[in-house]
Structures are given as structure tokens and as C-alpha cells.
Amino acid sequence: MVKVWNIVLRLVVLLFLAGNTLLLILMIISGATDHYPVNRFYWVQGNTTGIPNAGDETRWTFWGACLQDKDGSDTCTSNLAPAYPISPVDNFNTHINVPHQFISKRDAFYYLTRFSFCFFWIALAFVGVSFILYVLTWCSKMLSEMVLILMSFGFVFNTAAVVLQTAASAMAKNAFHDDHRSAQLGASMMGMAWASVFLCIVEFILLVFWSVRARLASTYSIDNSRYRTSSRWNPFHREKEQATDPILTATGPEDMQQSASIVGPSSNANPVTATAATENQPKGINFFTIRKSHERPDDVSV
């Protein structure tokens, strides 16, 4: 059952990485073509009637501003450029009939959208490489840590890009409304952007879970291998034998006479009693042993 759950979770992470990569690609190609469904992907749409060099409606996409005529046709080929800002002043090179907030907050619109453009590309690079390497982790577990690191950077840049672009689009919508012009956010584009952020969060959590679990499993396996190695019988290992304490007793003339008087001349004394008496004696170590010599009293050895 555990293996089944592992396979299911791996497939979920793989599916989320693939979906996240696809969402980022769809956002990046918005504005690159006039065909359906890509022409439905835009950040914000506003009424630009009366602004020179602009159409009746203008949609700001990832690559630039798409002009929409009254018949509903889109023209996205004339105003395309990398890091195209949501700024009618810079897009149409005019201040005439441009909403006032686009003029007073020109720098904010300019830098928010340009930085988000760069961050989206960086996020796509990290997420895309993470997706490719995660497929290879099924064959080699050495790439798991690298996938986690790359996905962490992808999560940070993707979230930053979506936050910056959402802020710029909301400010643009409010600027059109303050000038009594109609404007709306692109629901499809915003949905894909925040869906990619959600997928990044889920992917990051799952990858951290897998990394921590792999570390714990490796540590547990190492401990078990050490235990098994130490518990095996080694023919070249010899356990130390416990040395018995020597029992030394002092023997002298008086002791010999006392023992002789106790035992007596009879040779049929009970050896068990003598052994028990010997065991009951207090054990200790006497450093001096005196031996009696019949030849000379001076031959006493220490």
C-alpha cells in the first residue's frame, strides 16, 4: 500500500510540474498571434477611444498591446516588443486623452510590468528544467535535491512575477475607471497566472516532503546497517575473559598450628566442610606471605 501511495504522489508532482510549465508557456505566447484561443489571453483591456495611435479598445498582453476594432478583429503585430509596459504614454507616444494616473504614475506602471516580464522568463526556465529533471529522478535519486533547489527559485520568481503583473493590471483598470472609461481584467490570463502560483506552492511542499522523507529513510537505513554489522558473529573477534580475583591468604606458624589442631590427626575429615569454611572466609589480598623455614629463622621471604 505504501508503494502505491508513493507512485500516486510521484505522478501528482509530475502532473503539476507539467501543468505549471504549460501555463507559463501559454502566458508567454499571449499576444504573439491573433488566432483563437491565444487572442483571448490578455492582462487588461481598456477603452482607448480618442487617444492618438490607439484603437477603440486596447488589450495589453505579454508581448504588447493588441488593438481591437469595432468589428471585433484584433491587431497584435504592430505594437509588439519585449518587456512591453502597460503605459499608454509609452505605447502610443502621446499624452493626449490619456488617463491622468498613467501620466502621474508612469514609472510605477513602467517598472512593474517590465520586471514581471523578466521574472516570468526566469520562472519558466527554473520550472521547465525542474520538470525535465524530475522525470529523470525516477531513474536516479541523486537529482532530487537539485530539483528541489530549482523549484524553490522557480516558485519565488513565478510568485513575484504574478504579484507584480497583477498589481500593474489592477492599477491600469482603476486608472481607466477614474477617467470614466470602461476596463476589465483578462479573466483567462489572471486565472492561469494564479493557478501557476498555486501549483508552485503544492509542488514545493511535496518536494520538501520527499526530500525530508528520503533523508530520514537514508539515516534509518545507515543505522540499521551498522546494527546488523555489529551484531554479526566475527570469527576473528575474541571476547575478553573476565579475570578472577586471586585469593591470597597469609600463612604462618600460628595459622598452621591452628589448622592442624582443628583438623586433627584423623585423615577422614569432611572435605566439603573444609571447602565451605574456606569459601566463607573473608576474601582479600595480603601483600605479605610468610613462610616458615626449619633451617634458619633469618630465611624469611617477603
From Swiss-Prot:
Glycans are attached at residue 47. One of its GO terms (biological process) is protein localization to eisosome filament. Residues 1-10, 136-145, 211-302 are cytoplasmic. It is a multi-pass membrane protein. The modification Phosphoserine is found at residues 293, 301. The chain crosses the membrane at residues 11-31, 115-135, 146-166, 190-210. It is found in: Cell membrane. Keywords: Cell membrane, Endocytosis, Glycoprotein, Membrane, Phosphoprotein, Sporulation, Transmembrane, Transmembrane helix. GO terms for cellular component: cell cortex; cell periphery; eisosome; membrane raft; mitochondrion; plasma membrane. Residues 32-114, 167-189 are extracellular. InterPro entries: SUR7/Rim9-like_fungi. Involved in sporulation and affects the sphingolipid composition of the plasma membrane. Probably involved in endocytosis. Present with 17000 molecules/cell in log phase SD medium. Belongs to the SUR7 family. This is Protein SUR7. The lineage of its organism: Eukaryota, Fungi, Dikarya, Ascomycota, Saccharomycotina.
